[in-house]
Every structure is written in C-alpha cells, then in structure tokens.
Amino acid sequence: MKRHFETTRRIVIKVGTSSLVQTSGKINLSKIDHLAFVISSLMNRGMEVILVSSGAMGFGLDILKMDKRPQEISQQQAVSSVGQVAMMSLYSQIFSHYQTHVSQILLTRDVVVFPESLQNVTNSFESLLSMGILPIVNENDAVSVDEMDHKTKFGDNDRLSAVVAKITKADLLIMLSDIDGLFDKNPNIYDDAVLRSHVSEITDDIIKSAGGAGSKFGTGGMLSKIKSAQMVFDNNGQMILMNGANPRDILKVLDGHNIGTYFAQGK
C-alpha cells in the first residue's frame, strides 16, 4: 500500500532508551547525532517536529556509574533527575551543530487532564513551533507518582507520545523502536513471523499478537505501542512504528518507502 505524506507538516517522533543508550550502558552518540541531523533536515524543509525522548534513567545510570536501576522509587527519581539534565545538555550541544534550537517540556498526566493547564501547555507547544524551536518532551520522572488517589504518571513514553500527538494535533506520530514494526508473532522466537505493513484497525488478534492474554509475543513492550496506536486512531491520526537503528530511515518513510508498520484507518 502506497503511503502518502506529501501534506504532512507536524510530526511527533518518539525515541526510546534502547535507541539512545547502548547495551553496555554507554550513550550512543552516533545515533543521537544521526537523529539530530534527520530532525533538523525536516525542520529545514518547513516541517514542525516534536521529539518525545526517553532515556533519563539510562543517562543517569551512566553519569552516576551505576550498573543497574535502583529499587527504591525515590532513588529512581533522583537518578532520572540527574539523567534528564545530562540528556538535555547533550541534545542541546548536538542539535546546535545543525543550528537547531531545542527546548524542554516535562509533563505529568495531571497537566493534560485539567483544562487550564492543558491550554497552557498547548500554548507553549504552539509558541515554540511557531518560533522554529524543537520541543523535547519527557515525563517529569522526578515528581511523577502512581498512587491510587493521585495518579500523575502516563505509564510510559509510548502513551505520552500519543498524548502529545493529540494535544498538538500532529499529522503523524513516528515511533522508533528496537524492532522493525508489528509482527503477527514474536520474530525473536518464530522464524516465520511476518511483518504487518499496514494496520487499519486494532483487532483482538492484533492485541494478542502484541502481548495480550494467550500471546506468543510477550516481550518488547509491543502492547503499549498498540494501545498508543489505538489512542492515535481515536483522534483520527496516523502512526508509523519502525526500527530506530538508522534514524535516516525516517526520511525514506516520509518519501513513501514501505518501512515499518503503518497505522492508518481506512487508508
């Protein structure tokens, strides 16, 4: 199926920790530079881009020379707080090589639930984009909680990216993953797994293949991505799920190349 993005102007790109931090725990500088080049190239074409970036914990562990994530929530939040500063500092440095200015927006769920604060953050996005600035969004891990009477966490940045796409009325959400897209079953286990090129509806079969009950596909956080795709559908949007190994593939996708899985209703 031919994909047409000629009229796409506003894009949300979500990048996960696995695309920013190597398995050794070291920061993947080359990958971040490639991503900065691609995003800057899109902005130079006149597109508006919002980057939703995980990685605060990974950066914090690297900075603090810690081998593994701490168990205590307060310590996790402290490490993420340190990592967020380091991550934004690196983003600012690398994007400056391409004359791209960046900003930071840290969100909690209550900000987008209450109408007044939602309007404020919406205005902030619009102002930044109108000024040609790249908003870099993450959850405010240092203060987010998930208590029954005061839930402020989004859950993960897959969901956050779908929320950002909704409130900014983005034309397209591009979700970079460590897998090529949505398969009919786990490709790490089954050699005959088939990549789904196009998904027009989130069916029970797709939910099962992505990690639901009785699934063959139990790893990789794919279910969270499918739930995010449903949120995109609910807002009449479209989404690409693709491998983030080579960020320059984003340019190919926008040129219509059949890369990853394209989530679009009735297309």
Curated annotation (Swiss-Prot):
Chain residues that bind substrate: S54, D141, N157
Keyword line: Amino-acid biosynthesis, ATP-binding, Cytoplasm, Kinase, Nucleotide-binding, Proline biosynthesis, Transferase
GO cellular component: cytosol
Pathway linked to the protein: Amino-acid biosynthesis; L-proline biosynthesis; L-glutamate 5-semialdehyde from L-glutamate: step 1/2
Binding of ATP, residues: K14, S177, D178, T219, G220, G221, M222, L223, S224, K225
Compartments it resides in: Cytoplasm
A molecular function GO annotation: glutamate 5-kinase activity
InterPro entries named among the record's database cross-references: AceGlu_kinase-like_sf, Asp/Glu/Uridylate_kinase, G5K_ProB, Glu/AcGlu_kinase, Glu_5kinase, Glu_5kinase/COase_Synthase, Glutamate_5-kinase_CS
Name of the gene encoding the protein in the UniProt record: proB
Function: Catalyzes the transfer of a phosphate group to glutamate to form L-glutamate 5-phosphate.
Name of this chain's protein: Glutamate 5-kinase
Reactions catalysed, as given in the entry: L-glutamate + ATP = L-glutamyl 5-phosphate + ADP
Enzyme class: transferase
Coiled-coil blocks: none
Highest taxon, organism lineage: Bacteria
Pfam families: AA_kinase
Main location group: cytoplasm
Annotated family: Belongs to the glutamate 5-kinase family.
EC code: 2.7.2.11
PROSITE patterns, per the entry: GLUTAMATE_5_KINASE
UniProt-listed GO biological process terms: L-proline biosynthetic process
Record lineage: Bacteria, Bacillati, Bacillota, Bacilli, Lactobacillales
